Amino acid sequence: MEKTFSLSRRDDGIALLTMDVPGETMNTLKAQFAPEITAILQEIKADSSIKGLVLISGKADSFVAGADISMLDACETAEDARLLSRQGHHVFAELEGLNIPVVAAIHGACLGGGLELALACHQRVCSDSSKTMLGVPEVQLGLLPGGGGTQRLPRLIGIAKALDLMLTGKQVRPKQAVKMGLVDDVVPESILLDTAIEMALAGKKTRKPLKQPLVTKLLEGTPVGRNIMFDQATKQVLKKTQGNYPSPLKIIDCVREGMAKGMEKGLEVEAAHFGALVATPESAALRSIFFATTEMKKETGAGDAKPRKVAKAVVLGGGLMGGGIASVTTTKAKVPVRVKDISDKGLSNALGYAYKLLDKGVKRRHMTSAERDKLMALMTTTTEYRGVKDADIVVEAVFEDLNLKHQMVRDIERECGEHTIFASNTSSLPITQIAAAASRPENVIGLHYFSPVEKMPLVEVIAHEKTSPETIATTVAFARKQGKTPIVVKDCAGFYVNRILALYMNEAAQLLLEGQAVDHLDKALVKFGFPVGPMTLLDEVGIDVGAKISPILEKELGERFKAPAAFDKLMADDRKGRKNGKGFYLYGKAAKKGKKVDESVYSLLGLTPATGKEAGEIAERCVVQMLNEAVRCLEEGIIASPRDGDIGAIFGIGFPPFLGGPFRYMDTLGAAKMVRLLEGYQSKYGDRFAPAALLKAMAAEGKTFY
């Protein structure tokens, strides 16, 4: 069997330990490496000619991307996972215990177990490359750093900074890493190895003392101060997670125990908590999301079809969506983009939008002003169809007006090449209707982004019956280059995400009209696990947008999509939400003292607000509507699989990740229970709760989606 670790000796007494996992593009730590690395460490101990050790990666742009998550699936019990953690502790303790200087030379991803490996070294130096990122993202998988990270990290950079890294899973760049003391030096990649060797030759085996301001020292250096910090961190975690995620609290406990009772006790607690977390349904759900997105990256969305190269893009419309799409095309995909708008105002808006986002990067020192200007130069503008002929893809982001979109299709077919893809960012109009104006319908596709474009990870790629496989594959590849997670969905009003969202929002509106207070509704769904409640979401998206989409969905999909008639009163009162400072909540000066409901909405709708219903019942009524419609979408072939439905709901509307998505959640509940819930509500509130035929069939046969 090919080895992962190789040891080479230099004449100056420095040994290089190179990690290079055979057949993989990135290094990941696996349990089966333990005997191999242990044997090498014994060899180093026995060789008195070795005066220092440098750890490097044999991969081009990856130090160690973390532990191989798939090995956790082999753990049948919490005890199996605890022992896996203890095995890692033993190996890292052996490395840390070497009586020669050990230096980690880091270039590329240094994450999770990779950073824990580096923390077990005596010193760390990293390259200044944009590809170098350091962090412990285990919390995002419902886990904690199980290789000693909860103990070594706070001792190296301080408790507050360590908790911030571990509780958020955020990754830091080289300059941030050296500033916080995570690494000892940052150098160009070309001299990384030489610098690491010099550090090893210098013979420093002890860590630099932690430099902290006096207030931080008082807090972190005394039991009373530490308890204040841990209690505050716990409060913040519970406020953010609503208690739905167990791992952040376990991370705090590991640090608390380790700082109070010493490193060895801390490691024992870390392993025990790691084992327990691996066995939780929350971690299983979060790991399933990780595996699903990893798997999706390998798919074209169109079988064996090969994507064409996109060397130039055009965006039609310089509004909020157009500006965002143009921005991610230049900054993420690094593809030149030409923005066309009928007005100079629209064009300056698109340029301003992109500049503002890039300038944030400069202010945060993620890039230089020269790098910002280079990316801005990729974006050009026009009010006429000039400089668009060589475009490989045109993304249309104009008003939801079918006649206008037909005009855009005809214009692009006239002005661009015969292979140019026309991708519509429509949120509700069926692509088949848009393609009706095309003489080359095989080039027409839907590419539905979510707002704000730079933040929302999902795009829906919508193929109509005549869309060619090559067009699908090219559009999917283009979306991935923009940093998006694309799901391919079948053409239908509302597609997938807006369709399941519409019924959820309609049910929330029904609850409001039954007298439930706006903030009571929102709190119930946030407690369930959504990032924001439905009324806040409607204010953010725009009440007018909802009012525009509802009739389209009702016409195409039936009575159950009919929006409550009382919403006409909101439109008559010009309530559009945050965009015009008038919605369910107060905005501007009236909202200075925190988020407050605009009480006038109750009198407008003829309501007396109450908080009579339990939060659980409110959430259940809204959520079962979403789940039931997701099943209908699967039944109709709108989505290709439960996996795509889960990813679409989590990344598109913030369905609680710890539940794994609508379909995994239904598997947890059981199809029979889902049918009982729906039929119970159907008898009370009518046929909008009628269970999907597929769900009833699954309940009868005891089947699951996965």
UniProtKB/Swiss-Prot annotation:
Catalytic activities: a (3S)-3-hydroxyacyl-CoA = a (2E)-enoyl-CoA + H2O; a 4-saturated-(3S)-3-hydroxyacyl-CoA = a (3E)-enoyl-CoA + H2O; a (3S)-3-hydroxyacyl-CoA + NAD(+) = a 3-oxoacyl-CoA + NADH + H(+); (3S)-3-hydroxybutanoyl-CoA = (3R)-3-hydroxybutanoyl-CoA
InterPro entries (UniProt xref): 3-OHacyl-CoA_DH_NAD-bd, 3HC_DH_C, 6-PGluconate_DH-like_C_sf, ClpP/crotonase-like_dom_sf, Enoyl-CoA_hydra/iso, FA_oxidation_alpha_subunit, FadJ, NAD(P)-bd_dom_sf
EC number, as in UniProt: 4.2.1.17, 5.1.2.3, 1.1.1.35
3-hydroxyacyl-CoA dehydrogenase: annotated segments: 308-706
Biochemical pathway: Lipid metabolism; fatty acid beta-oxidation
Superkingdom, taxonomy of origin: Bacteria
Any one Gene Ontology BP term: fatty acid beta-oxidation
Chain segments carrying region Enoyl-CoA hydratase: 1-188
Entry's family note: In the N-terminal section; belongs to the enoyl-CoA hydratase/isomerase family.
Role this protein plays: Catalyzes the formation of a hydroxyacyl-CoA by addition of water on enoyl-CoA. Also exhibits 3-hydroxyacyl-CoA epimerase and 3-hydroxyacyl-CoA dehydrogenase activities.
Protein name: Fatty acid oxidation complex subunit alpha
